[in-house]
């Protein structure tokens, strides 16, 4: 222990000296910048050198701090163990002298338990929680030391101007003034109802200090972004309860639409629906404690040490975090890898309900670990919770599976999971939708084509789908070659374009295909008509020149507006940009995204950006429709693709005679999956189909036995008229 203490002292001393060097160097940088106007040539040479030296020192200091963390942690463990031994020895000596019976032993784990849960509901907190909390406290102290350096007390440049969204300005102090303090200066009521801030366009914790002059927006629960933060913080409350109750490994808690969930890995057991009330009670206790959310930015290397007990967090750090540092949040005993932001404390969450559990897979891959998923919802008042419960009751009554059974539209069977059996009335709705969308395509000069259902894997390798999508494809071997059922039509349509030379005079070429598609969805994800393995889609592809792009995308947007106004849906548009696993050059992606943005601006409807949510071959415009219950469903998509024409070497002869010109492909699906659209329509209409879609438009009722013959004759006559 003595050696470790000496080592820690040496590291701390070196760290202090280097922090002082950093302060001096920064002072020099600021001095040079002030002199820049008077002597730009001299300062230009000195400035970069000093800033590089600062960067090198900071990088070395990060390593020193990490070493110091571990040394301090070892010392704390050793001292704590020694103190427990000495305390136990003194207590034993005292009892021996007094002749008293020894009281029940109490371990450090029980002290942690008391801090976590005053009611002592948790009998055995996970062992990793104690070490994690100690580690976090060391990180926090180091962060406070670093923050003190940035505060630069007494420096007049520390004064900042904060502009609030309503136009008023407030004076503050850099690295001290928080958005919550700004809100409280306006009114305490505003401060208490604000969920999260937006600082210079970036979501920001209310208690996170401002770093300079800023424009601050104060968002309440009425704002969509604030609701997402509110539910994300609620998920952390659920995560704390899951960790305490099960001792499992927390995985992830992505923001949901109107609710939240948390995935947890339990090696030898499962979550039971009977345990949900217990989890809800634990969440309520956590909320009552008003545990503050604390944010720290920490190096990835240190976080790998902090989360060494959790293989899932380590995977995220190694595979998803590309930056040298990232953030963690603490509330109570929970320390979680998270980008944030969060509400101020758990007491901000007034009402919570844990209502469902299910199974999931890590990364949605059935080959990976099976996880337990628990769902919850929360609100700032009882009235909103009551409205939500009423909406859920209405949603259960409108469930398309219930309507399908009651109206004899369709059913599923275990002998063909994920493939729907449409009964006569359901087939009537299905075919009416297909006929409707087919006619809409014909009116817009699309040419209908038919393409094969299965292809050699060589096609999918050429398109890139084999590398990115093969786990979702049904494959089989024929004559020593691997084939797959098609999950989409675009590669087949590329073969159609390439089967003969093409000229600019033919462009744009618009192909529409209504064939059957198959996707190997995980069995746990199958859910009625909303997620199936066999489906039909109005899958269209437009091959056009770069100069035709803007007009064609405009036509696609007008197409989807026409169709969804027929159904009576309102919608919102999302531009999904380059994902991490993208194909091709960044320059092409930037050009494609710019084209889509221009088209959306000209279309004139509200839209927003979904960063990183594009397809691997190109950016896309997704449409989300709003149903009668206020829920959003993603349906139509317009995707721009510069990659497939290059991968398939698709060319046409341009107007100036260049026969090596690559076309651009626009992927268009207006309804998307017909099966999924039937599910959405049945729930939106509550089973009360509009006349043109209804499978029972007319019913002939004879008033008596003498009229039956005439009624049958009339019915046959109408059938013949419909067929003609």
Swiss-Prot record:
Pfam families reported in the protein's UniProt record: TGS (PF02824), tRNA-synt_2b (PF00587), tRNA_SAD (PF07973)
What are its E.C. numbers?
6.1.1.3
State the coiled-coil residue ranges: 44-72
The UniProt entry, under InterPro entries, shows: aa-tRNA-synt_IIb, aa-tRNA-synth_II, aa-tRNA-synth_II/BPL/LPL, Anticodon-bd_dom_sf, Beta-grasp_dom_sf, TGS, TGS-like, Thr-tRNA-ligase_IIa
Asked whether the UniProt record includes Cytoplasm among its keywords, one would answer yes
Task: Map out region (Disordered) in residue numbers.
Answer: 90-112
What keywords sit in the KW lines? Acetylation, Aminoacyl-tRNA synthetase, ATP-binding, Coiled coil, Cytoplasm, Ligase, Nucleotide-binding, Nucleus, Phosphoprotein, Protein biosynthesis
What GO biological process term is on the record, naming one? threonyl-tRNA aminoacylation
Top-level taxon of origin: Eukaryota
Identify the stretch annotated as signal peptide in this record. none
- Among the entry's GO cellular component annotations, what is one? mitochondrion
Q: Which residues carry this modification: N-acetylalanine?
A: 2
Modification Phosphoserine occurs at? 451
Q: Name one GO molecular function term.
A: threonine-tRNA ligase activity
Describe the location of the TGS domain by residue ranges. 155-220
Annotated catalysed reactions? tRNA(Thr) + L-threonine + ATP = L-threonyl-tRNA(Thr) + AMP + diphosphate + H(+)
Record's subcellular location:
Cytoplasm; Nucleus
Q: What does this protein do?
A: Catalyzes the attachment of threonine to tRNA(Thr) in a two-step reaction: threonine is first activated by ATP to form Thr-AMP and then transferred to the acceptor end of tRNA(Thr). Also edits incorrectly charged tRNA(Thr) via its editing domain, at the post-transfer stage.
The record's similarity note reads:
Belongs to the class-II aminoacyl-tRNA synthetase family.
Instruction: Please name the PANTHER family in this protein's record.
Output: THREONINE--TRNA LIGASE 2, CYTOPLASMIC, THREONINE-TRNA LIGASE
Description of how the protein assembles with itself and partners:
May be a component of the multisynthetase complex (MSC), a large multi-subunit complex which contains at least eight different aminoacyl-tRNA synthetases plus three auxillary subunits AIMP1, AIMP2 and EEF1E1. Interacts with the MSC components EPRS1, AIMP1, AIMP2 and KARS1.
Supply the name of the protein.
Threonine--tRNA ligase 2, cytoplasmic
Species name:
Bos taurus
């Amino acid at each position: 222990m003595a050696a470790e203490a000496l080592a820690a002292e040496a590291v701390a001393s070196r760290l202090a000296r280097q922090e002082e060097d950093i302060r001096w160097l920064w002072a020099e940088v600021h001095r040079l910048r002030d002199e820049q106007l008077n002597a730009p040539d001299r300062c230009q040479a000195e400035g970069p050198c000093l800033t590089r030296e600062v960067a090198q020192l900071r990088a070395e200091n990060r390593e020193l701090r990490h070493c110091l963390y571990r040394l301090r942690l070892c010392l704390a463990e050793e001292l704590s163990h020694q103190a427990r031994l000495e305390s136990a020895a003194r207590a034993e000596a005292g009892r021996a002298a007094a002749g008293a019976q020894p009281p029940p032993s109490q371990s450090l784990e029980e002290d942690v338990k008391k801090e976590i849960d005053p009611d002592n509901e948790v009998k055995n907190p996970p062992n990793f929680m104690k070490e994690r909390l100690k580690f976090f406290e060391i990180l926090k102290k180091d962060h406070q030391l670093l923050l003190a350096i940035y505060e630069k007390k007494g420096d007049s440049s520390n004064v900042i101007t904060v502009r609030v969204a309503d136009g008023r300005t407030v004076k503050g102090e850099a690295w001290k003034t928080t958005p919550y303090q700004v809100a409280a200066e306006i009114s305490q009521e505003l401060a208490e109802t604000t969920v999260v801030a937006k600082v210079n366009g970036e979501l920001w914790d209310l208690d996170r200090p401002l770093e300079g002059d800023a424009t601050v927006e104060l968002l309440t629960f009425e704002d969509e972004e604030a609701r997402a933060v509110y539910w994300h913080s609620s998920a952390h409350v659920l995560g704390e309860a899951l960790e305490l109750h099960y001792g499992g490994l927390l995985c992830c808690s992505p923001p949901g639409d109107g609710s939240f969930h948390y995935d947890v890995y339990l090696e030898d057991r499962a979550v039971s629906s009977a345990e949900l009330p217990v989890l809800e009670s634990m969440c309520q206790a956590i909320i009552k404690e008003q545990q503050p959310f604390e944010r720290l930015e920490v190096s990835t290397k240190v976080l790998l040490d902090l989360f060494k007990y959790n293989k899932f967090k380590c995977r995220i750090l190694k595979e998803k975090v590309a930056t040298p540092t990232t953030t963690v949040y603490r509330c109570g005993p929970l320390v979680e890898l998270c980008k944030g932001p969060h509400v101020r404390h758990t007491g901000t969450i007034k009402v919570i309900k844990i209502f469902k559990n299910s199974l999931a897979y890590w990364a949605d891959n059935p080959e990976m670990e099976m996880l337990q998923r628990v769902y919850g919802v929360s609100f700032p008042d009882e009235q909103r919770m009551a409205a939500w419960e009423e909406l859920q009751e209405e949603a259960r009554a409108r469930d398309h599976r219930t309507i399908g059974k009651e109206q004899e539209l369709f059913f599923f069977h275990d002998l063909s999971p994920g493939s729907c059996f449409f009964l006569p009335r359901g087939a009537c709705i299905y075919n009416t939708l297909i006929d409707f969308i087919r006619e809409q395509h014909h009116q817009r000069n699309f040419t209908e084509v038919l393409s094969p259902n299965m292809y050699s894997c060589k096609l999918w390798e050429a398109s890139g789908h084999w590398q990115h999508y093969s786990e979702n494809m049904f494959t089989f071997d024929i004559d020593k070659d691997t084939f797959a059922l098609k999950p989409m039509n675009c590669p087949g349509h590329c073969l159609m374009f390439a089967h003969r030379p093409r000229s600019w005079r033919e462009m744009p070429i618009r192909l529409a295909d209504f064939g059957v598609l198959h996707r190997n969805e995980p069995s746990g994800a199958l859910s009625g008509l909303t997620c199936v393995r066999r489906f039909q889609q109005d899958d269209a592809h437009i091959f056009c020149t770069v100069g035709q792009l803007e007009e064609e995308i405009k036509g696609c947007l007008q197409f989807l507006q026409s169709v969804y106004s027929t159904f009576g849906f309102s919608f919102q548009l999302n531009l999904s940009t380059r994902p991490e696993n993208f194909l091709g050059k960044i320059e092409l992606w930037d050009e494609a995204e710019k084209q889509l943005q221009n088209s959306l601006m000209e279309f004139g409807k509200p839209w927003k950006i979904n960063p990183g949510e594009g397809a691997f071959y190109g950016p896309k415009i997704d449409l989300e429709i709003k149903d009668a219950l206020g829920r959003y469903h993603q349906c139509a998509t317009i995707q721009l693709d510069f990659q497939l024409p290059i991968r398939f070497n698709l060319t046409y002869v341009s107007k100036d005679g260049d026969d090596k010109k690559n076309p651009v492909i626009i992927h268009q699906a207006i309804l998307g999956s017909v099966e999924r659209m039937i599910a959405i329509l049945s729930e939106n209409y509550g089973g009360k189909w509009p006349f043109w879609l209804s499978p029972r438009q007319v019913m002939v009722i004879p008033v008596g036995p003498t009229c039956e013959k005439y009624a049958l004759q009339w019915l046959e006559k109408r059938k013949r008229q419909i067929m003609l």
